[in-house]
């Protein structure tokens, strides 16, 4: 059967919050089958831990943030993206501040942490959410959509009127039966424009942002001396964010996701629209690995002895 996955051991890292600028210690712990993805603020007294769910996303202006019973955790999308990319079903995430550390602005450091901790299979069937019919959310010319598809495929288009972005690819399609999350998506960094950074800082935000954890652009060019990691890093980062936003469902998706000029808010609204329509989705498990979509048959991160053939 296709099994659930967790960490072999706990692991910690320290970084800064992108918006708060605060020093943050993040600890990732193994969790029992069917636990799901659970956050806990250890700096708050008597704070109950909470499981990620779309309705707990309360802020999507600059990042994806969860809030439950007064405990808020912001900038979850890169960590959530890494968990999705490595197929982690069950994990406890502890933080001593209100924001996941930004690290280098991508999901790469979180992928490294998860791989260092080790990934193990558990004696429980992995549960998927399968898209049964098209679900769409629109605002003006922006839109996001789920379609039925036996696998996991994403199509994302951005439209930035900036010379440094326009000459890179502004559309990308990835089918995870054929493409590697780690190699092709995970290292794409968040990006921002200098005039926006200055405005955010005047409001007490982006205090932890720097050229070490973001691509920064002025009116004409990329300011980072090392340039881009991918030719199409801008749109790849938007896809990285979307993968993390969608994993707030708590289960991997079997279906196709398409987006045009979308962000955290629209991604979350699409999840809410999906869950509100009971005819649009169903849970799925696979007793035989060969019956599962190719995107999920040979999960990344397992020891070679556990890789499926």
UniProtKB/Swiss-Prot annotation:
EC number(s) from the headed UniProt entry: 3.5.1.108
Active site per the UniProt annotation: 264 (proton donor)
Keywords annotated in UniProt: Hydrolase, Lipid A biosynthesis, Lipid biosynthesis, Lipid metabolism, Metal-binding, Zinc
InterPro entries according to UniProt: Ribosomal_Su5_D2-typ_SF (IPR020568), UDP-acyl_GlcNac_deAcase (IPR004463), UDP-acyl_GlcNac_deAcase_C (IPR011334), UDP-acyl_N-AcGlcN_deAcase_N (IPR015870)
Binding-site list for Zn(2+): 78, 237, 241
Enzyme class: hydrolase
Cofactors named for this entry: Zn(2+)
Catalytic activity as recorded in UniProt: a UDP-3-O-[(3R)-3-hydroxyacyl]-N-acetyl-alpha-D-glucosamine + H2O = a UDP-3-O-[(3R)-3-hydroxyacyl]-alpha-D-glucosamine + acetate
GO cellular component, one term: membrane
UniProt-recorded Gene Ontology molecular function terms: metal ion binding; UDP-3-O-acyl-N-acetylglucosamine deacetylase activity
GO biological process: lipid A biosynthetic process
Pathway(s) per entry: Glycolipid biosynthesis; lipid IV(A) biosynthesis; lipid IV(A) from (3R)-3-hydroxytetradecanoyl-[acyl-carrier-protein] and UDP-N-acetyl-alpha-D-glucosamine: step 2/6
Domain of life assignment: Bacteria
SUPFAM superfamilies (alphabetical): Ribosomal protein S5 domain 2-like (SSF54211)
Family to which the UniProt record says this protein belongs: Belongs to the LpxC family.
Role description: Catalyzes the hydrolysis of UDP-3-O-myristoyl-N-acetylglucosamine to form UDP-3-O-myristoylglucosamine and acetate, the committed step in lipid A biosynthesis.
PANTHER family the record matches: UDP-3-O-ACYL-N-ACETYLGLUCOSAMINE DEACETYLASE 1, MITOCHONDRIAL-RELATED
Entries under NCBIfam families matching the protein: lpxC
Name of the protein in its database record: UDP-3-O-acyl-N-acetylglucosamine deacetylase
């Amino acid at each position: 059967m296709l099994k659930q996955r967790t960490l072999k051991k706990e692991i910690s890292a320290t970084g800064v919050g992108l918006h708060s600028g605060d020093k943050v210690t993040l600890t990732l712990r193994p969790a029992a089958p069917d636990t799901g993805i659970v956050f806990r603020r250890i700096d708050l007294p008597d704070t109950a831990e909470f499981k990620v769910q779309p309705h707990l996303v309360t802020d999507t202006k600059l990042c994806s943030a969860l809030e439950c019973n007064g405990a808020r955790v912001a900038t979850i999308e890169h960590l959530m993206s890494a968990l999705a990319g490595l197929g982690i079903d069950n994990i406890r995430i502890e933080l001593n501040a209100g924001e996941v550390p930004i690290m280098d602005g991508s999901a790469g450091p979180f992928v490294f942490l998860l791989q260092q901790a080790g990934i193990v299979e558990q004696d429980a069937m992995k549960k998927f959410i399968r898209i049964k019919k098209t679900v769409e959310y629109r605002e003006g010319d922006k839109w996001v959509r789920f379609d039925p598809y036996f696998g996991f495929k994403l199509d994302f288009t951005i439209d930035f009127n900036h010379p440094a972005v326009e000459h890179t690819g502004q559309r990308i399609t990835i089918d995870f039966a054929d493409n590697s999350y780690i190699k092709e998506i995970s290292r794409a960094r968040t990006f921002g424009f200098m005039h926006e950074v200055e405005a955010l800082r005047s409001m007490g935000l982006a205090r932890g942002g720097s050229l070490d954890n973001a691509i920064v652009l002025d009116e004409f060019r990329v300011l980072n001396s090392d340039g881009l990691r991918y030719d199409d890093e801008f749109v790849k980062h938007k896809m990285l964010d979307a993968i993390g936003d969608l994993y707030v469902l708590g289960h991997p998706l079997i279906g196709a996701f398409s987006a045009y000029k979308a962000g955290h808010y629209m991604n979350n609204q699409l999840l809410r629209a999906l869950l509100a329509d009971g005819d649009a989705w169903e849970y799925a498990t696979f007793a035989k690995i060969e019956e599962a979509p190719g995107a999920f048959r040979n999960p990344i991160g397992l020891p070679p002895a556990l890789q499926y053939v």
